[in-house]
Amino acid sequence: MNIGQAPEPDYDSVKIDYVGFVDPYAVEGMVVLKADNGKEFHMRAFSGEVAKHITSFGETEGEPAPSIYRMIEEICEQNELTLVKVKIYDSGDVLRANLYFTGKKDLVLRNQRASDAMALGAYYKIPILVRKKLLKEKLEA
């Protein structure tokens, strides 16, 4: 797939609708990703620290970005690359993601941790795409 190619029909663009924690100690994070059609994907089983970072990226006066995010930003700047989208998919029992960069040349980093990729998507405010089969109708309690 080329970077500028039209979106694949089996992926939907999502927004981060909710960020929280599964446990009272904020060890395990969770997010709810929501598509324009209202379908949701609940993602969990990742570090509570990543959830805290995602929350801080949306704040105007939050904590400074962790050094790893600044390091990736510097690597991109020095190599004239820009992260343009993140695609989340299932691979067996785990979630993985592809990171799409463009610039001097197109680059795709495949099979990365989905939670880290989603955090980068939130940090850079870029499209986050999720495989449609992962999206479900919202359940009312």
Where are these predicted regions, by residue range?
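Divalent-cation
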Residues: 2-141
